């Protein structure tokens, strides 16, 4: 409680409604071109969340666990949580899985933007908690941080919170999700010469690829589909990967994420070709197949959204009103069973799961 009072006092910005509306419009127009700038989404959520947050507050005031959360105002910050201790917990506990997720994707709850524009301290706390709990939602629903997985989680959050900004994310996500994604998966570490011009970017048994689902290998011709003329160049694939890594944090150039897979040591890569305004992926020149192919946009619309809707309505309590910190040392499956949470189905795990 004490920590959040200080956070609230140091972060609240008191501006009039006209200024809030101006900020809202500016952030909405900038979110699409810069989706990686999460503070823009947070500001838009702050300004548009008034009535939804008030409804959440009214619900939590009538719930025993919610009352305790509002009174104590726990936070996922170093002052309240000993994160290093969570790493020492048994591997199937919620706390261990949470830390594994954060370290895999280089995240921290501290990175979540606090509420700035909500005057009521309880309502401001609810919105801040919702953002901090977001990463735990990834863990309990077993969703990675790809665009399609984030969109599925936003649908769950929309049903549980009714926050308008989640609806915006759900509507925009299909337009930002790649049409195709091909994955290049290593069982252990990435070869040291992976970004060297002479690296052979083809399916090679020496690298011990994982094929967990025994999926059919696909023939795919880069030049025929993407009209790329330069792939015969010895340095083409090197330039392709170099461009991807150089622009990884520039969402206007690269739409997508690195997904860490098997044992948190794999790279599954996509590349956005700015010149052709299309997505480019590895072509196997020797065996004429990719290791794994799927269609993220189709997956989102036909599989992830239906699953997210179903699991959200059957979950018996929204995450923000659960004292999840008290569950860190307990089995994650018991947590899911207690609140009737259905994680991502195993058949979708390789595409959108944490693995």
Curated annotation (Swiss-Prot):
Further comment found in the protein's record: This protein may be expected to contain an N-terminal transit peptide but none has been predicted.
Organism ancestry: Eukaryota, Sar, Alveolata, Apicomplexa, Aconoidasida
Transmembrane residue ranges: none
Cofactor: Zn(2+)
EC number: 4.1.1.130
Species of origin: Plasmodium falciparum (isolate 3D7)
Residues that coordinate or bind Zn(2+): 134-135, 138, 150
Record protein name field: Ubiquinone biosynthesis protein COQ4 homolog, mitochondrial
Protein encoded by which gene: COQ4
Recorded topology in the membrane: Peripheral membrane protein
Keyword terms: Lyase, Membrane, Metal-binding, Mitochondrion, Mitochondrion inner membrane, Ubiquinone biosynthesis, Zinc
GO CC annotation terms, alphabetical: extrinsic component of mitochondrial inner membrane
Pfam family membership, one: Coq4
Quaternary structure and partners: Component of a multi-subunit COQ enzyme complex.
């Amino acid at each position: 409680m004490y920590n959040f009072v200080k956070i609230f006092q140091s972060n609240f910005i008191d501006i009039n409604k006209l200024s809030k509306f101006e900020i809202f419009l500016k952030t909405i127009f900038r979110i699409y071109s810069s989706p990686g700038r999460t503070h823009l989404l947070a500001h838009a959520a702050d300004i548009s969340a008034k009535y939804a947050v008030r409804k959440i507050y009214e619900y939590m005031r009538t719930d025993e666990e919610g009352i305790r959360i509002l009174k104590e105002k726990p936070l996922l910050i170093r002052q309240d949580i000993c994160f290093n201790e969570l790493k020492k917990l048994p591997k199937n506990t919620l706390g261990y899985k949470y830390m594994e997720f954060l370290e895999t994707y280089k995240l921290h709850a501290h990175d979540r933007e606090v509420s700035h524009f909500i005057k009521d301290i309880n309502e401001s706390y609810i919105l801040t908690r919702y953002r901090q709990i977001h990463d735990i939602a990834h863990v309990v629903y077993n969703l990675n941080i790809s665009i399609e997985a984030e969109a599925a989680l936003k649908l769950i959050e929309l049903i549980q919170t009714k926050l308008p900004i989640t609806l915006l994310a759900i509507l925009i996500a299909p337009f930002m999700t790649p049409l195709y994604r091909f994955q290049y998966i290593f069982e252990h570490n990435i070869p040291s010469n992976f970004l060297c011009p002479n690296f052979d970017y083809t399916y090679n048994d020496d690298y011990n690829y994982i094929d967990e689902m025994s999926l059919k290998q696909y023939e795919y011709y880069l030049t025929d589909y993407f009209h790329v003329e330069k792939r015969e160049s010895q340095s083409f694939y090197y330039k392709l990967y170099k461009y991807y890594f150089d622009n990884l944090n520039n969402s206007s150039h690269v739409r997508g994420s690195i997904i860490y897979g098997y044992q948190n040591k794999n790279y599954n890569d996509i590349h956005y070709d700015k010149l052709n305004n299309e997505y480019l992926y590895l072509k196997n020149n020797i065996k004429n197949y990719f290791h794994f192919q799927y269609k993220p946009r189709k997956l989102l619309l036909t599989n992830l959204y239906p699953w997210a809707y179903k699991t959200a309505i059957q979950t018996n309590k929204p995450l923000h009103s659960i004292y999840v910190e008290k569950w860190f040392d307990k089995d994650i499956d018991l947590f899911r069973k207690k609140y009737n949470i259905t994680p991502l189905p195993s058949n979708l795990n390789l595409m959108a799961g944490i693995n």
